[in-house]
Amino acid sequence: MSNHEQFDVVIVGGGPAGATAAHDLARRGRRVLLLDRAGRIKPCGGAIPPRAIRDFDIPDHLLVAKARSARMIAPSNTKVDIPIEGGFVGMVDREHFDEWLRERAAAAGAVRRNARFERVGVDNDGMSTVIFQDGAESARHTVRARSIIGADGARSAVAQQTVPGAEKTKYVFAYHEIVEAPEVKPSDYDGTRCDVFYQGHLSPDFYGWVFPHGGTLSIGTGSADKGFSLRNATTSLRAAAGLEHAKTVRREGAPLPMKPLPRWDNGRDVVLAGDAAGVVAPASGEGIYYAMLGGRLAADAAEELLVTGDSRCLAKARKRFMKDHGKVFWVLGIMQYFWYSSDKRRERFVSMCKDKDVQKLTFDSYMNKELVRAKPLAHVKIFFKDMAHLLGLAKV
């Protein structure tokens, strides 16, 4: 019999996905170990919609800003302002937001360790083990796990070691700079507005952003083109926003998955969540809500495994996610592939967003995380407007 410490669930990665899974399982009375590396902050605009605030009980004090509108900037510098009617998009600083989520999990009973994951192994009785290096002691430890949740981000080591096909995942790369909000504001500055730049020199296949974070701002961009300089593009973006002289607080970069992995479990005791599972929305790059939802679904699947012993239940995490959000991801993927492919198309895309029907349906879907079906005539109108832009018949 092994003398290694045993947990019901070991969760690798303490971002929104892993911390949410740890919290949910600990509240159910499960013995949970949450492993996370200290000092790792992911580049992220920090936007969380009302659905995330409601579903995951996010307190107001974590919101460093409340965005009341979005501005879309075309290649010609044409601007389209879109008000967020009757609500707001919460903005968080990931450094503090993620730590709060981890602390909430610990308060519910999860055990936290500052550690670097090394590998999944097998004990002498066949139970899985997790081997990690302690961040404080630099000592190697082994624990036993009845179930494992891999929430260790894009290029997940857990996924690549345990889930078939995970190594084939394709990625885009994101980079941003957190800067101090200047005391003397640029003439067009608005601390309650998210600015989105659809311009090829800032990204050949994505967009650049300037998002308010209260006393700071997130300024960044992303691309799948490995030869494209994200740092140079961000420098240009800062100049365009009048923030080239703002003090830089920190710089962060990381890969992001391009689409959900075809499989999230190993058919035995491992299930993936968050970026490790590929749940970053195409076109928008949104990941916080989907990561937290993925963490919750992974926790549900792990709980069912612990109760029933039936490993087939692990596949339910992906099935449930794709049932509710797969169509949205597919639509966003098509949209990004087409509209972000040239400045001519970007110009038409921004022009199309002047339409009030497009604005309302887009924000209704974003805020509530579901395709809006209540107004079929509006969908028909948008279809014909879309076709006019696709065929070049609409005025820009």
Question: Where in the sequence are the language-model features?
Answer:
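Beta1/beta-strand and adjacent pyrophosphate-binding region of the FAD-binding site
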Residues: 2-15
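Glycine-rich FAD pyrophosphate-binding loop
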Residues: 10, 23-44
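N-terminal Rossmann-fold NAD(P) dinucleotide-binding loop
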Residues: 18
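Generic enzyme active-site microenvironment
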Residues: 34, 150, 273
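C-terminal helical "tail/cap" subdomain of flavin- and related membrane-associated enzymes
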Residues: 303-396
